[in-house]
């Protein structure tokens, strides 16, 4: 387990970060909206600089997300894909899955099943 960078907004968004070899799981919580998206992007860019083969975002604790959060996810997906790596959204709520479907991003962004061990499986799969 690893902490965040001590930034107040990021500390409120991130419950914890687990890194295991080539995989990283970021456990997010709260509301992912325009107010926090720039800080979320900075955090994910920092994680991308570690060159994981798989970056999983566990959304179990996320209450709300808007189009700015989707933009962060797409940007991160493209960055990782350019490095032959993968972004996965883990434990998406029905509302998040519906938003991905309505925006046609469900074909672009990989999702993992909603279960307590889904994020841990991401760590073991690579």
Please give the residue ranges for each predicted region.
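Conserved G/P- and acidic residue-centered "switch" motifs that form tight phosphate/ATP-binding loops
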Residues: 66
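STAS-like cytosolic regulatory interaction modules
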Residues: 1-63, 75-126
């Amino acid at each position: 387990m690893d902490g965040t960078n001590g930034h107040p907004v990021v500390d409120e968004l991130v419950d914890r970060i687990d890194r295991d070899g080539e995989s990283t799981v970021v456990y997010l919580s709260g509301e992912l909206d325009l107010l926090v998206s720039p800080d979320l992007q900075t955090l994910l860019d920092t994680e991308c600089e570690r060159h994981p083969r798989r970056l999983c975002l566990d959304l179990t604790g996320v209450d709300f997300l808007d189009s700015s959060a989707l933009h962060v996810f797409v940007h991160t997906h493209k960055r990782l894909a350019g490095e032959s790596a993968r972004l996965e959204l883990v434990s998406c709520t029905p509302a998040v899955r519906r938003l991905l479907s309505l925006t046609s991003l469900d074909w672009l962004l990989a999702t993992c099943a909603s279960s307590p061990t889904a994020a841990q499986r991401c760590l073991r799969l690579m």
